[in-house]
């Protein structure tokens, strides 16, 4: 990403004990040195509140993808997988979309999917996933919590996983927003 690109950082999603939660931090960074905003909201409810979506990457690019994904959700009556696959196909086939520098996590009560910057749709094996600069930290923390602290709720796991990422990654802050289904 260029030094003048605004980008956002860490999103984590988990399904646990019949509940789903997605967490995102609030930091938006300009280039590699300047924090432009600390209270951005990168996790959103879509399709009558039945779908959660979160982004990491270029803010402008992510909003473009949000809009396109929401259109696909409406077109396919809230079918998450179909909407994600159709978005990915459009993403791969459109020269302008292929230039976008963002990733999405989308989820409903039944599935979690990552729509990657190359137009791939990936379903995690273990009902949790993270993206962005702090994604590996959040994913590691989330796996540990899921395996060794299964008494926690999905919401608590999402929050604590993001908190660990914020403690380690300079591009992730602790202004954490968690949405649940």
Curated annotation (Swiss-Prot):
NCBIfam families: ATP_dep_HslV, PRK05456.1
Homology family: Belongs to the peptidase T1B family. HslV subfamily.
A GO term, aspect molecular function: threonine-type endopeptidase activity
Reactions listed under catalytic activity: ATP-dependent cleavage of peptide bonds with broad specificity
One of the record's GO cellular component terms: proteasome core complex
Domain of life, source organism: Bacteria
Pfam families: Proteasome
Entry EC number(s): 3.4.25.2
Residues annotated to bind Na(+): 166, 169, 172
Organism annotation: Staphylococcus aureus (strain bovine RF122 / ET3-1)
Disulfide bond annotation, renumbered to this chain: none
Subunit structure: A double ring-shaped homohexamer of HslV is capped on each side by a ring-shaped HslU homohexamer. The assembly of the HslU/HslV complex is dependent on binding of ATP.
InterPro entries cross-referenced by the UniProt entry: ATP-dep_Prtase_HsIV_su, Ntn_hydrolases_N, Proteasome_sua/b, Proteasome_suB-type
Keywords of this entry: Allosteric enzyme, Cytoplasm, Hydrolase, Metal-binding, Protease, Sodium, Stress response, Threonine protease
Activity regulation behaviour: Allosterically activated by HslU binding.
GO terms, biological process: proteolysis involved in protein catabolic process
Active-site residues, record numbering mapped to chain: 9
Chain's role: Protease subunit of a proteasome-like degradation complex believed to be a general protein degrading machinery.
Subcellular location: Cytoplasm
Main subcellular localisation: cytoplasm
Protein's recorded name: ATP-dependent protease subunit HslV
Transmembrane segments annotated in the record for this chain: none
């Amino acid at each position: 990403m260029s030094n003048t690109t605004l980008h956002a950082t860490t999103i984590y999603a988990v399904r646990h004990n019949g509940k789903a939660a997605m967490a995102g931090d609030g930091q938006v960074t300009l280039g590699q040195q300047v924090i432009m905003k600390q209270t951005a909201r990168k996790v959103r409810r879509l399709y009558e509140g039945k779908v959660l979506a979160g982004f990491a990457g270029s803010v402008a690019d992510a909003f473009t993808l949000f809009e396109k994904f929401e259109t696909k959700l409406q077109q396919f009556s809230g079918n998450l997988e179909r909407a994600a696959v159709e978005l990915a196909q459009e993403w791969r086939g459109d020269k302008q979309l292929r230039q976008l520098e963002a990733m999405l996590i989308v989820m409903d009560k039944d599935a979690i999917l990552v729509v990657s910057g190359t137009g791939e749709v990936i379903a995690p094996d273990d009902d949790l996933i993270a993206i962005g600069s702090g994604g590996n930290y959040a994913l590691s923390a989330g796996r540990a919590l899921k395996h060794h602290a299964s008494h926690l709720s999905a919401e608590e796991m999402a929050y604590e996983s993001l908190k660990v990422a914020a403690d380690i990654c300079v591009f992730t802050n602790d202004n954490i927003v968690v949405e649940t289904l």
